[in-house]
């Protein structure tokens, strides 16, 4: 009986959040261990479907770096990185598009649809579909400057590495109206039809900004942002984040992630969240409990 009462209390705790967020859009960047382990993949699919069933509109943007690396290795192609970005020549770009837009994207769609019921379905997209992601070649020197990583100019031609120029939300809105869950591969295209490999964090940020989403949520392999003492920060604003970057508390691969959060907030997204995707049902635990489990970032 006590367990039943406890379950009822959990549902009651979630009720105000369900009421608050019904009809809102959440953009979720899916990556890391949450994409690799079978039990976490199932938990993620269940979380996404739960959001949709209670009236929240989830939009998924996924990564796929390890899968790209594995395919390149199988094909005998070398993976080269500069400052965490994959140098992407034309041949590598073809593999990136095949892996992200095909193998990874469709596996996520199939997983969600396996557990979906009734009239809800997931559908896979790349930037080419409906002109969703207009991209351009990344200004690598400016990118590294913003990340506090200053590199010699001659090292900065990364090939088909791009950045988002524009998000056309029309196809996403049509899918939402028809009860589909969009699953987006971070491949963009320019007006000449050239394909670009784009950091999925910044695609998620741009999509959230274009949709004026309530939240953008990043699944990672860490507990959240850490303060100067190494403790997880439950809530933080942009001013403090910038100070922590200047002081070297936030560094390395976390800088692009928090920059993506800041970019989303600057475009009208209400909150950004960094969650530990290694925790089953981390999305539900963050959104529908008072304490949460990760770090929320506000303006």
Swiss-Prot record:
**Which segments of the protein form a coiled coil according to its record?**
none
Gene Ontology CC annotations of this record: cytoplasm
Sample GO molecular function, one term: ATP binding
- Determine if NAD is one of this entry's keywords: no
Q: Where in the cell is it found?
A: Cytoplasm
Keyword ATP-binding on entry = yes
Q: Which GO terms describe its biological process?
A: arginine biosynthetic process via ornithine; L-arginine biosynthetic process
Pathway per its UniProt entry is: Amino-acid biosynthesis; L-arginine biosynthesis; N(2)-acetyl-L-ornithine from L-glutamate: step 2/4
Give the family from UniProt: Belongs to the acetylglutamate kinase family. ArgB subfamily.
* The protein, known as: Acetylglutamate kinase
Species annotation? Persephonella marina (strain DSM 14350 / EX-H1)
Q: Which gene encodes it?
A: argB
